[in-house]
Regions:
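Conserved beta-strand hairpin/beta-sheet module of binuclear metal-dependent hydrolase folds
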Residues: 4-65, 154-157, 161-165, 267
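Metallo-beta-lactamase
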Residues: 5-9, 103-152, 208-211
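Active-site-proximal loop/helix segment associated with metal-binding centers of metalloenzymes
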Residues: 148-152, 168-203, 247-252
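FMN-binding flavodoxin-like domain, especially the glycine-rich phosphate-binding loop
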Residues: 175, 186-224, 228-231, 273-289, ...
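Active-site neighborhood of phospho(di)ester-bond hydrolases with catalytic His/Asp-centered motifs
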Residues: 49-51, 73-81, 101-104, 163-167, ...
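Short acidic active-site motifs
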Residues: 88, 294-299
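Active-site metal-binding motif and surrounding structural segment of the metallo-beta-lactamase
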Residues: 44, 55-102
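Structural motif
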Residues: 45-47, 75, 137, 161-164, ...
Length: 399
């Protein structure tokens, strides 16, 4: 049976949620599931804004047929061609053979790659700030290349002032009845997933997100309808500010994240002692993660949130411990900038991982690397407490 939500008098949400999927993009854990949002506008012309993942295709078509209530579908606006949003375009075309696909020129090759139906004779190609009148409503189209695919664009309803933001302003997490962000405690229950979604999916493309935010700032926006997560109709500025912070690589919090790898517990012990000394110096916002049991997406996200980062690891086969190396390479791939970073290294012989960890961060922009690396030979010796104290002081003094 259909399950739809009314967004405005003539706009409906016809998406759904997947709580069975373990890994988003087969990479990122989503214990709270994920929603795939799609919207239908009932104007003089009917408009579908994006489709959904194949996993909820049955519900999607029930919802679409229910909302159309016997009307044909005139337009399908394709804001983003990633398969979790475009998977059923071919089925839409088969069910509604007269539908026109509204997209930009970069979308056309992707349509041909994913689907076998003739594309050119059913597409309406739009460019920056082109418009489409559907009766009462007029859509304007804003290109958003590499947020986070090259063909991405957003659509703006100039009448109701609604931004259909594609993957922008999305979040992990299934919709549990409440569609609107103001109906839930977003900061408590959704913000961590919103941050982890943005940082891991889009975080590499901060410059491109900043460009889109500048374009959006010229529009009067009363509502944001993303392709994942809740719809925003209140307090939009708060969430937009989060995106501005994340995409400009500014720390969200004055906080210390300590990520450690430990084979037999000795490096963990050193990390615990450092955290205790930081707390003694008045540092209140400290987060600790064991990289062997914490998914890298969490640590990458926390690296964007926190102003100060500490990485503690043993040397392993002459290099950085495998799980730590994975995390650091992921942080590097997301082009993190503007952090204060400290290191602790361990090894029973040939301790080299501290130098190698530093080299990774030396290649990133705006990094303040604290020179006083703590070097441990197997286990932290009693005489080394002063070294940990000195490192704690160096971190605390820069906060």
């Amino acid at each position: 049976m259909h399950c739809v939500k009314k967004v405005t008098d003539d706009l409906y949400w016809i998406g759904g949620s997947d709580r069975r999927l373990a890994l988003f993009e087969n990479v990122y854990p989503i214990p709270r599931g994920v929603s795939y949002n799609s919207y239908v506008l009932l104007d003089e012309k009917t408009v579908l804004l994006d489709t959904v993942d194949a996993s909820i295709s049955g519900l999607f078509f029930e919802n679409l047929e229910y909302v159309l209530n016997g009307r044909t579908l005139d337009y399908l606006i394709v804001n983003h061609m990633e398969p979790d949003h475009c998977a059923v375009i071919g089925d839409v075309v088969r069910r509604y053979p007269d539908v026109k696909l509204v997209c930009n020129a970069k979308t056309v090759p992707m349509l041909k790659q994913f689907f076998n139906f003739p594309v050119e004779d059913r597409t309406v190609i739009v460019k920056e700030m082109d418009t489409l009148c559907t009766g009462k409503h007029t859509f304007a189209f804003v290109m958003a290349p590499m947020v986070h695919w090259p063909e991405a664009m957003v659509s703006y309803d100039t009448v109701d002032k609604i931004l259909f933001s594609a993957d922008g302003f999305g979040t992990f997490g299934a919709i549990n009845g409440n569609l609107f962000a103001d109906e839930v405690n977003f900061e408590r229950d959704w913000l961590d997933d919103a941050r982890r979604y943005f940082i891991n999916i889009v975080g590499k493309y901060g410059v491109q997100v900043q460009n889109l935010l500048k374009k959006a700032a010229t529009l009067e926006i009363k509502m944001i309808c993303p392709l994942h997560g809740p719809v925003w109709r209140e307090n939009l500025g708060w969430f937009i500010e989060k995106y501005d912070t994340w995409s400009s690589y500014k720390p969200e919090d004055q906080a210390v994240m300590i990520a450690y790898a430990s084979i037999y517990g000795n490096t963990e012990n050193a990390a615990e002692i450092l955290a205790s000394k930081l707390a003694d110096k008045g540092v209140k916002n400290i987060a600790m993660y064991d990289v062997s049991v914490t998914d890298p997406s969490v640590i990458v996200s926390e690296s964007f949130r926190c102003s100060h980062l500490v990485f503690a690891a043993p040397t392993y086969n002459g290099g950085i411990f495998i799980k730590m190396d994975e995390v650091l390479r992921d942080i590097e791939a997301h082009s993190l900038k503007n952090r204060t970073v400290a290191f602790m290294e361990n090894g029973t012989w040939a301790v080299t991982c501290g130098k190698q960890m530093k080299e990774i961060f030396a290649g990133l922009k705006g990094m303040n690397l604290i020179e006083d690396t703590v070097t441990i030979k197997s286990a932290l010796a009693d005489g080394q407490e002063a070294q940990v104290e000195k490192l704690a002081e160096a971190i605390a003094e820069t906060m």
